[in-house]
Amino acid sequence: MEGGRAPACTTQVSFVCQRCSQPLKLDTSFKILDRLTIQELTAPPLTAAPARPGDAQEESALSEEAFTEGRQDGVSRRFIPPARMMSTESANSFTLIGEASDGGTMENLSRRLKVTGDLFDIMSGQTDVDHPLCEECTDTLLDQLDTQLNITENECQNYKRCLEILEKMNEDDKEKLQTELKELALEEEQLIQELEDVEKNRKIVAEDFERVRAEAERLEQEEAQYQKEYCEFKRQQLELDDELKSVENQMRYAQMQLDKLKKTNVFNATFHIWHSGQFGTINNFRLGRLPSVPVEWNEINAAWGQTVLLLHALANKMGLKFQRYRLVPYGNHSYLESLTDKSKELPLYCSGGLRFFWDNKFDHAMVAFLDCVQQFKEEVEKGETRFCLPYRMDVEKGKIEDTGGSGGSYSIKTQFNSEEQWTKALKFMLTNLKWGLAWVSSQFYNK
């Protein structure tokens, strides 16, 4: 009855290619396989050696056994390997449709699938290729087999030619070949021995190479270290060379300065005596005063300080010690000290004003200084009789005479004297000191 039927079930089953794993649609000839066709497909490949009678029976029995249906309670049970079949919803798969009560139709389809799967298993077991294959993979496989077949045929032809050559040989040729074979065997042994020796030598050479390589690495490291040290020493050398050149230049410059200083007259460089108009000057300080040119007393005092310092230096250079007075150079406040009266100081500086006209210490100091210049002249004349100053000095009167010129005498004092005559007397005194300076320089610095 229709009411007693179970609902229909649908199962889609398809085979897949064992190379590209694409689903396959089997040919319709797989549905009409008879026993004879199955035996032909499952028969083992033909061999050159005759087969034993029992082998054919065993193979037939195996074939029969492989396709024997396992029936139990009227139901055929067979597991379809997932590697060859898969359930899909594809349109290329075939569909098993049946009812639970219609056991005959399902049994036939299951049997057919079992036979097909077993057939593919047998084909895969007899060859090196897994089945089933799609058309494209089959064409590719056939091309590979054709290539292998061509290679095998060529090898077979070569073997046939070698066999024909061997069959044509006589006994002498065989003996000759045997002898040659023995010689080749001996040569092979020798070559093997040589190869062993070469291998031993190779090992020795490899060990030597490793040792030499290690030594080379060590030498490279030492070379790098030496190069580093060399660069450091080179840098130090360059620095020392620069320093040496600098020192040499400094020495050269110092030597030039020394030579220049040796040629330089200290007195001439230190005390520059010249004139500026009616004034005598020492180191650019004017010594004297005119009504038209009222020189500041600070400048006059500074000029007297330089004059005292000059005469003091000349006396020390000659080893002269003055009598009656001692020169005390003290800048613009220089003075003379009386040796007979230690408490008596004769200042060679003045501030001007009314006190200047009534205080005669300044005049006494200038006369005392003129006395010291006269002592210097007399000391020089002791060793140099030809020495003579341009202007004669009269210490008692405190005057300087212009013997080579006008023949007049000029007082070095300020009291009861005009500024013009006082200034001229100071100018003549500086001229005498300039001559004394020149003589000392010629005696002590130009030798």
Curated annotation (Swiss-Prot):
<dbReference type="GO" id="GO:0010508">
    <property type="term" value="P:positive regulation of autophagy"/>
</dbReference>
<keyword id="KW-0963">Cytoplasm</keyword>
<keyword id="KW-0472">Membrane</keyword>
<dbReference type="GO" id="GO:0000423">
    <property type="term" value="P:mitophagy"/>
</dbReference>
<dbReference type="GO" id="GO:0032465">
    <property type="term" value="P:regulation of cytokinesis"/>
</dbReference>
<dbReference type="InterPro" id="IPR007243">
    <property type="entry name" value="Atg6/Beclin"/>
</dbReference>
<feature type="region of interest" description="Evolutionary conserved domain (ECD)">
    <location>
        <begin position="242"/>
        <end position="447"/>
    </location>
</feature>
<dbReference type="GO" id="GO:0005776">
    <property type="term" value="C:autophagosome"/>
</dbReference>
<dbReference type="Pfam" id="PF04111">
    <property type="entry name" value="APG6"/>
</dbReference>
<keyword id="KW-0256">Endoplasmic reticulum</keyword>
<keyword id="KW-0175">Coiled coil</keyword>
<dbReference type="InterPro" id="IPR041691">
    <property type="entry name" value="Atg6/beclin_CC"/>
</dbReference>
<dbReference type="GO" id="GO:0031966">
    <property type="term" value="C:mitochondrial membrane"/>
</dbReference>
<dbReference type="GO" id="GO:0000407">
    <property type="term" value="C:phagophore assembly site"/>
</dbReference>
<dbReference type="GO" id="GO:0006995">
    <property type="term" value="P:cellular response to nitrogen starvation"/>
</dbReference>
<dbReference type="GO" id="GO:0051607">
    <property type="term" value="P:defense response to virus"/>
</dbReference>
<dbReference type="GO" id="GO:0010008">
    <property type="term" value="C:endosome membrane"/>
</dbReference>
<comment type="subunit">
    <text>Component of the PI3K (PI3KC3/PI3K-III/class III phosphatidylinositol 3-kinase) complex.</text>
</comment>
<dbReference type="GO" id="GO:0000045">
    <property type="term" value="P:autophagosome assembly"/>
</dbReference>
<keyword id="KW-0131">Cell cycle</keyword>
<keyword id="KW-0333">Golgi apparatus</keyword>
<dbReference type="GO" id="GO:0034272">
    <property type="term" value="C:phosphatidylinositol 3-kinase complex, class III, type II"/>
</dbReference>
<dbReference type="GO" id="GO:0051301">
    <property type="term" value="P:cell division"/>
</dbReference>
<dbReference type="InterPro" id="IPR038274">
    <property type="entry name" value="Atg6/Beclin_C_sf"/>
</dbReference>
<keyword id="KW-0132">Cell division</keyword>
<keyword id="KW-0496">Mitochondrion</keyword>
<keyword id="KW-0968">Cytoplasmic vesicle</keyword>
<dbReference type="InterPro" id="IPR040455">
    <property type="entry name" value="Atg6_BARA"/>
</dbReference>
<dbReference type="GO" id="GO:0043548">
    <property type="term" value="F:phosphatidylinositol 3-kinase binding"/>
</dbReference>
<feature type="coiled-coil region">
    <location>
        <begin position="139"/>
        <end position="266"/>
    </location>
</feature>
<keyword id="KW-0051">Antiviral defense</keyword>
<dbReference type="GO" id="GO:0034271">
    <property type="term" value="C:phosphatidylinositol 3-kinase complex, class III, type I"/>
</dbReference>
<dbReference type="Pfam" id="PF15285">
    <property type="entry name" value="BH3"/>
</dbReference>
<dbReference type="GO" id="GO:0005789">
    <property type="term" value="C:endoplasmic reticulum membrane"/>
</dbReference>
<feature type="region of interest" description="Disordered">
    <location>
        <begin position="44"/>
        <end position="71"/>
    </location>
</feature>
<feature type="region of interest" description="Required for membrane-association">
    <location>
        <begin position="422"/>
        <end position="447"/>
    </location>
</feature>
<dbReference type="GO" id="GO:0005794">
    <property type="term" value="C:Golgi apparatus"/>
</dbReference>
<comment type="function">
    <text>Plays a central role in autophagy. Acts as core subunit of different PI3K complex forms that mediate formation of phosphatidylinositol 3-phosphate and are believed to play a role in multiple membrane trafficking pathways such as initiation of autophagosomes, maturation of autophagosomes and endocytosis. Involved in regulation of degradative endocytic trafficking and required for the abscission step in cytokinesis, probably in the context of PI3KC3-C2.</text>
</comment>
<dbReference type="InterPro" id="IPR029318">
    <property type="entry name" value="BH3_dom"/>
</dbReference>
<dbReference type="GO" id="GO:0030674">
    <property type="term" value="F:protein-macromolecule adaptor activity"/>
</dbReference>
<keyword id="KW-0072">Autophagy</keyword>
<keyword id="KW-0967">Endosome</keyword>
